Amino acid sequence: PKNIAGPKVSDEEVLKHSLKEAEKKFKKKFDVIVDLDPTSPLRNINDIKKALNKFIKTNCDNLITGSKPYKNPYFNMIEIKNKSVSIVKKSKKKYYTRQNSPKVYDMNASIYIWKRKALYSNNLITKKTAFFEMPRERSIDIDSKIDLLQVLSIIKEFKRNNIKIKI
């Protein structure tokens, strides 16, 4: 529907609509929703299984996935406000390398798992959100042409080295 189409609509709104339609169609109420983002094609079945196991074991409200970042907001990410440049995440302590900066992660938009009530809370991250770390090479989210080229290059390299991809 038009009201949930377009770049300004959250994934959560689309999921709520899909859940409502699925429950109508199957005449069932679903307690858990698993969202596998189509723009993250390199995740594999083991990533999904491990994320689900962590979701169950931690009794969290929802689970998000991510990977180690290329940049760190305490060290080498900036923002520009009123022509003034500053580090994104300010801290009293100075960090001279990315490696000794506080550990942060990139959300990779690969796997989201929600308890029904958490999906309707309208908060992606809460005190009961769990995190599952995936390797960088399977965490590419295709948002641009360069992302697509990177994914195609990885797939080509896997094929060249006869590495099986279980997607």
Task: Label every model-predicted segment.
Residues 1-29:
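Conserved N-terminal catalytic core of the sugar/cofactor nucleotidyltransferase
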Residues 2-5, 38-40, 136-138:
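Glycine-rich "substrate-gating" loop/helix at the edge of Rossmann-like oxidoreductase active sites
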Residues 7, 11-13, 17, 41-129, ...:
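Conserved core of the sugar-phosphate nucleotidyltransferase
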Residues 27-41:
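Short beta-strand-to-loop acidic/aromatic patch adjacent to the donor-nucleotide binding site
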Residues 28-30, 57-61, 158:
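Short, high-confidence coil segments that cap the C-terminus of an alpha-helix
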Residues 132-133, 138-167:
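Hydrophobic helical membrane-anchoring modules
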